[in-house]
Amino acid sequence: MLFRSGMDRIQGFCDTLALHPDYQIIGRADSAGQLEVAMPQMDRLLEQGIVPDAVMCLNDPSALGAMAALQEHGLLEKTAVYGVDGAPEAKSMISEGAMTATAAQSPIRLGQITAQTVYAILNGEDYEKEITVPVELVTKDNVNGYDMDGWQ
């Protein structure tokens, strides 16, 4: 089951692609955000003859699962793989050149904002109903500027 943020992430990706006719979605699979689900789902798509140029995953564990399937089929080096989270494992894969990028979230910042919002609610203060927290795209060009063992 996807949470609203996951559904919004997927919808935003699809909406953005719809604005660019050079790109098309050739396959979709639900990984439930889990590596162990993403790998067989990606394998199934590949066995159906769906060979992507790029794979956009719900999160970094899904990206790692998709990468494992692509590797088994000899396609990882030919496929751009994107994840979301900025997980240490994803940053390591980016550093090694196996993964293309991850949109790094900051669990620390998310926790701070959540605590501030709960505090405001409990004190009867005004609070933002919708909060956007910026992310950073981690690529091979900037991955060394991040803590490889931790989160942002």
Spans of features found by a protein language model:
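Extracytoplasmic "Venus flytrap"
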Residues: 3-8, 59-60
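A general structural signal for well-ordered alpha-helical segments in protein cores
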Residues: 10, 63, 111-115
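Flexible loop/hinge segments that line or gate small-molecule binding clefts
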Residues: 76, 85-100, 138-151
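Short beta-strand elements at the ligand-binding edges of bilobed clamshell
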Residues: 28, 96-108
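Conserved beta-strand scaffold positions in the cores of enzyme catalytic domains, especially
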Residues: 25-28, 81, 102, 130, ...
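Hinge/cleft segment of the Venus flytrap/periplasmic-binding protein
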Residues: 1, 5, 16-20, 106-152
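Hydrophobic alpha-helical
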Residues: 12-13, 24-27, 31-92
